[in-house]
Curated annotation (Swiss-Prot):
The gene is alkA. InterPro entries: Ada-like_dom_sf, Ada_DNA_repair_Zn-bd, AlkA_N, AlkA_N_sf, Alkylbase_DNA_Glycosylase/TA, DNA_glycosylase, HhH-GPD_domain, HhH_base_excis_C. It comes from Mycobacterium tuberculosis (strain ATCC 25618 / H37Rv). GO terms for cellular component: cytoplasm; peptidoglycan-based cell wall; plasma membrane; protein-DNA complex. This is Probable bifunctional transcriptional activator/DNA repair enzyme AlkA. Is involved in the adaptive response to alkylation damage in DNA caused by alkylating agents. Repairs the Sp diastereomer of DNA methylphosphotriester lesions by a direct and irreversible transfer of the methyl group to one of its own cysteine residues. Also catalyzes the hydrolysis of the deoxyribose N-glycosidic bond to excise 3-methyladenine, 3-methylguanine, 7-methylguanine, O2-methylthymine, and O2-methylcytosine from the damaged DNA polymer formed by alkylation lesions.
Length: 496
């Protein structure tokens, strides 16, 4: 989009917040870059350039605007709707792959050489993987500087910088100030720094409209005991992260989500934040979805009633795949009970000072040691879970932020006991494919019949072609028409 100068300039003239995250505005006369909705007077057209990412702007020597804080914008929805290698790379970088495995590890996951990957990213997003990871480190550092009392040395290493000097230089170049000045400026803007060790409070930005009742209701109704709960108006869950465990509390509002993270290790902050955004589908483009689905007369009323539906997703793709298999042909409550047994038997214990969470969801390595006695499911279902876990453990099946959606579908369908419903639900909620469509889902077919749409799988699939590439969101809208606990927020009964 940044290549369309006229459209971008109209967006900054109208200060249209819908475009925040799609591109940044580099101002040649001041050397700063802004988000499209920056409240200052728009610069003359001759004095601006439009760049695809904050990393591209920083790479060309521009500093972040202190007024609009463009590095804190919602992420670009472009990377969530595309399945090409650049989009997959961007999702993996957001998950912290470069900091954990280096550029070589990122390239290997994608099946490209380092040089090929550098060339692709530079051409499309204006920055290579190292520059993109550096911009993320800067954002992590800024959050820790502004919302905690951590010493700056601890901030530097938690954010992924290799030295204090590199940290100070990056802050000065990106923000035109020192860490001390950033913390001082933040004191008037933010709540006082959290007193609890390992705790950080964030405000996750959201593109409006945001129909949070659907996504939070779904997460609440399917909560796994010991791993997830609803308490004091917040959805809470445990996190299994690269450097340790975490607990997150997420409280919705119309234009943001309040996120309280308790982490064993602050090096996990960037990854935890990215996974929370992914869980709630916060980087979706609701305007584009509403425009496309609302064009169908059969869906117009449903979409208009609650525009801005998000897909209830996951913090761990492999976890969701296991839970999807456990949910085959059973009630929502039974699926949660089965998963709760696994959590209690194989999950890592956590200490929850503010609630009743007890364990993380087990890792694939832990599930590889599974005792069938912990699963009160048919033997055929046990075989499916064992085959799924074995494939994930030996890496013949890869389910992560950067996997190829179509290839993953094919690999899932090759497993015994995995049919189209399971594969599509995993693609939709586990992998984030915006065009997944579980046509055989009973709830989806009941909702379709209620609206006068075809209720048979094949006929409904044919009809759904008009909703592409947003069939996952059409599914979510249809589900919301049913009387079911997944559509209740706050839940009518305690979830713990």
């Amino acid at each position: 989009m940044h290549d369309d100068f006229e459209r971008c300039y109209r967006a900054i003239q109208s200060k249209d917040a819908r475009f925040d995250g799609w591109f940044v505005v580099a101002v040649l006369t001041t050397g700063v870059y802004c988000r499209p909705s920056c409240p200052v007077r728009p610069p003359f057209a001759r004095n601006v350039r439009f760049l695809p990412t904050a990393a591209a702007a920083q790479g060309e020597g521009f500093r972040a605007c202190k007024r609009c804080r463009p590095d804190a914008s919602p992420g670009s929805p472009e990377w969530n709707v595309r399945s090409d290698v650049v989009a997959r790379a961007m999702r993996l970088i957001a998950d912290g792959t470069v900091d954990r495995d280096g550029v070589s590890g990122l390239a290997a996951q994608l099946g490209y050489t380092i040089r090929q990957l550098e060339r692709l990213l530079q051409a499309v997003v204006g920055a290579g993987p190292l520059a993109l990871a550096r911009a993320q480190r800067m954002q992590t550092a800024r959050v820790l500087i502004e919302t905690t009392n951590l010493p700056f040395g601890d901030v530097a290493f938690a954010a992924g910088f290799s030295s204090i000097r590199q940290f100070n230089d990056t802050v000065r170049l990106a923000c035109d100030g020192t860490p001390t000045a950033l913390r001082a400026r933040a004191a008037a803007r933010f709540e006082s720094a959290t007193a609890s060790a390992g705790t950080v409070s964030l405000r996750l930005p959201v593109r409006a409209p945001f129909a949070f009742e659907g996504v939070f209701g779904h997460l609440a109704a399917t909560a796994v005991p010991g791993c997830e709960e609803v308490r004091d108006g917040a959805y809470r869950r445990t996190l299994r992260l690269p450097w340790g465990n975490g607990i997150v509390s997420l409280t919705p509002a119309p234009d943001h989500v309040r996120c309280l993270l308790v982490l064993d290790d602050f090096r996990d902050l960037m990854t935890a934040t990215a996974r929370c955004r992914r869980l709630l589908d916060l980087d979706a483009d609701p305007e584009a979805i509403v425009e496309a689905l609302g064009a169908d007369p059969d869906l117009r009323a449903v979409v208009g009633k609650a525009p801005g539906q998000r897909i209830p997703r996951t913090v761990d793709e492999a976890e969701f795949a296991v839970r999807a298999v456990l949910a085959q042909q059973v009630s929502t409550k039974a699926a949660s009970t089965h998963a709760g047994r696994l959590v209690a038997a194989y999950g890592r214990p956590v200490h929850d000072r503010h609630g009743a969470l007890t364990h993380t969801f087990p890792s694939i390595e832990q599930l590889a040691e599974i005792d069938p006695g912990h699963l009160a499911v048919p033997k055929a279902r046990q075989r499916t879970i064992n085959a799924l876990v074995a494939s994930l453990a030996d890496k013949s099946l890869v389910l992560d932020a950067g996997c190829d959606w179509q290839r993953a579908r094919g690999q899932l369908l090759a497993l015994p006991g995995v049919g189209p419903w399971t594969a599509e639900v995993i693609a939709m909620r586990g992998l984030g494919d915006p065009d997944a469509f579980p046509a055989s889902d009973l709830g989806l077919r009941l909702a379709a019949k209620k609206l006068g749409l075809p209720a048979q799988r094949r006929a409904l699939t044919v009809h759904s072609a008009r909703w592409r590439p947003w069939r996952s969101y059409a599914t979510q809208h249809l589900w919301t028409t049913l009387e079911h606990p997944v559509n209740q927020w706050p839940p009518q009964e305690k979830i713990a």
